[in-house]
């Protein structure tokens, strides 16, 4: 993994906060709750010596040590911690583009591989219409049951999206998937794109 980028502004801000803490040898720990899922959250916390985990990875910085949670480490690839001054004082931001991306390979369970391609390839395209699709279940020897939401629910083009977009992409990427089925109630057209 390449080191997490801590901008100079973020470093100085965090060093200032650490200087106000009681005690010595306090660092910052970065971790992700529920890494590789849509609910992933990237977090920073003070890290006293007794709070370090044996498998944490140390990244030495000018004024303190950044402790990287080992489980979160692959999901923190290309992460950037920055600080920007504003009228309210300032804001610390963490950008971790891989936090919600599942780490999969060809031996991963079928459901994980389906969710991976839904999140990384299919939903970004559907988002342009305010829609998304999620996996509900896998039935009958490899048939994925999907549910559309947002602008896709009730959309008149959903059959074409399902067959020519979603199913085609998933079958190309996952050879052991046999097909897809839509479990969405499309009678609700309140937010439909078409």
From Swiss-Prot:
Pfam families, per database record: Fe-S_biosyn, NifU
Keywords assigned: 4Fe-4S, Iron, Iron-sulfur, Metal-binding
Signal peptide: none
GO biological process, one term: iron-sulfur cluster assembly
Cofactor: [4Fe-4S] cluster
Superkingdom per UniProt: Bacteria
Cofactor note: Binds 1 [4Fe-4S] cluster per subunit. The cluster is presumably bound at the interface of two monomers.
Keyword Ligase among UniProt keywords: no
GO molecular function, one term: iron ion binding
Binding-site residues for [4Fe-4S] cluster, renumbered to this chain: 152, 155
Self-association state and partner proteins as the record states: Homodimer.
Family the entry assigns: Belongs to the NfuA family.
Function of the molecule: Involved in iron-sulfur cluster biogenesis. Binds a 4Fe-4S cluster, can transfer this cluster to apoproteins, and thereby intervenes in the maturation of Fe/S proteins. Could also act as a scaffold/chaperone for damaged Fe/S proteins.
Protein name (Swiss-Prot/TrEMBL): Fe/S biogenesis protein NfuA
Source organism phylogeny: Bacteria, Pseudomonadati, Pseudomonadota, Gammaproteobacteria, Pseudomonadales
């Amino acid at each position: 993994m390449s080191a997490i980028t801590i901008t100079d502004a973020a470093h100085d801000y965090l060093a200032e906060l650490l200087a106000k803490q009681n005690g010595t040898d306090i660092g910052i720990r970065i971790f992700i709750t529920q890494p590789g899922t849509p609910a992933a959250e990237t977090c920073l916390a003070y890290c006293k010596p007794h709070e370090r985990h044996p498998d944490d990875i140390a990244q030495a910085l000018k004024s303190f040590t950044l402790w990287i949670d080992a489980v979160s480490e692959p999901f923190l690839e290309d992460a950037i911690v920055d600080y920007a001054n504003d009228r309210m004082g300032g804001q610390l931001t963490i950008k971790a583009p891989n936090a919600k991306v599942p780490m999969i390979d060809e031996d991963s369970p079928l459901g994980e591989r389906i969710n991976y391609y839904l999140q990384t390839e299919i939903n970004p395209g559907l988002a342009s219409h305010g829609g998304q699709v999620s996996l509900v279940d896998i039935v009958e020897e490899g048939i994925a049951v999907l549910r559309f939401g947002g602008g896709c629910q009730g959309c008149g083009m959903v059959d074409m999206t399902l067959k020519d977009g979603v199913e085609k992409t998933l079958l190309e990427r996952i050879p052991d998937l046999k097909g897809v089925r839509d479990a969405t109630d499309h009678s609700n057209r309140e937010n439909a794109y078409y």
